[in-house]
Amino acid sequence: MSELLTFGLEQLNTQLTRIDGCLRELTEEQVWSRLTPQGNSIGNLCVHLAGSEYQHIVSGIGGKPFIRERSQEFSMSGGLTPQELRERLHAVRNQSCEALSRLTEQDLDKRVSLLFKLEDWQEMKGSAARDTEPCVTRSIRGHLMYTIEHYANHTGQIVLLTKWLGGVQ
């Protein structure tokens, strides 16, 4: 495995360890509580991270079927325990490791397109969505970098929310 892939997985695993620690400290009620009606709960962020990682790495890079309901990731208000959220995140990570383990250094420059459902694309892009295809095309390297940055961003939010809710993280 290339140095970038190894480093990328190390970074993703570091973030997952942080999320694990947060989820171990919180009740199901805390995991699904929102600071504001428009805000996301820790549960929403975990489901969103699992969906995004699956779409970018497992499906986009790894070629598995596209299975994602992005809008539901933010509308959920419960239904998964902290343990079930951890299991979901780890299941996706295991699939990501499998997909990335098959790549060579040369594969990192291959371009991969990710399709989005039109309603998700419009929600993400706003008025700019009218003029573009609901698709993101970038190199595998780019998808990996995006996933690492995205995961770290939301991990920071999860850690902050955990502290706000009284967890130690």
Regions found by a protein language model. Name each.
Residues 1-6:
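Basic/polar N-terminal segments that are highly enriched at the extreme N-terminus
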Residues 8, 15-19, 81, 85-99, ...:
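Alpha-helical packing segments of well-folded alpha/beta enzyme cores
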Residues 9-13, 30-75, 116-169:
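Short, contiguous alpha-helical
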Residues 23-30:
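Long, hydrophobic N-terminal alpha-helical segment
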Residues 25, 48-51, 91:
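Residues within well-ordered alpha-helical secondary structure of globular protein domains
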Residues 100-110:
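Proline-centered turn/helix-capping motifs that create local helix->coil transitions or kinks
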